[in-house]
Amino acid sequence: MTTLPVSPIPHPGIIRVAHSPDADDAFMFWAMAAGKIDTGGRRYVHELGDIESLNRRALAGELEVSAVSLHAYAYLADRYALLAHGASIGDRYGPRIVAREPAPRDPRAALARCLIAVPGELTTAFLTLRLYQPAARHVVVAFDQIEDCVASGNADAGLLIHEGQLTYADRGLHLWADMGEWWYQETQLPLPLGGNVVRRDLGESLMRAIARDLKASIEYGLAHRD
């Protein structure tokens, strides 16, 4: 997979922090961007996007700091370092495969004959699907449109991430498989889904400072849960 030259910081002293609109991401990064912690003069600005868009932007080297899928990180490690704080780990819970019909006796075998709407080919969700049933066909659909795609009959099944994992039943859809639970049964381990990365060309000193700021931002959120 090819990558493009990295982009410089657009304005001196301003660091773009990109993440999904999920509440857990906002929780992690809010104190950094809202001026609630001492960042030593480093200014952070939020940029929101779905995880596949963030994966692609990081692949192009556009962002200083970003949430990414751990599947995508395999293609990013040469230019981004994985930060130690704020990873997304599924403990017997993860991306969910749903369909209009109730689950058959052997969902895994049935999926080999299905067209599955997926949220992106760089997502960890997609990687787990390929491990679970490599014969399944897929079509890439925006993560927040997958339920509609399945309900309307444009795909046989959907691979859900974010809030769709919780709301699919409201659309009359049925759970066929939970990739986090499947992964646990296979490995007895939690499923690593995503993490935060920082661009290596910022230099070790600034990278370490950003890592400290992210840790402090998470600690601030934990101390101010209201």
Q: What residue spans do the PLM features occupy?
A:
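Pocket-lining segment of extracytoplasmic ligand-binding domains
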Residues: 144-226
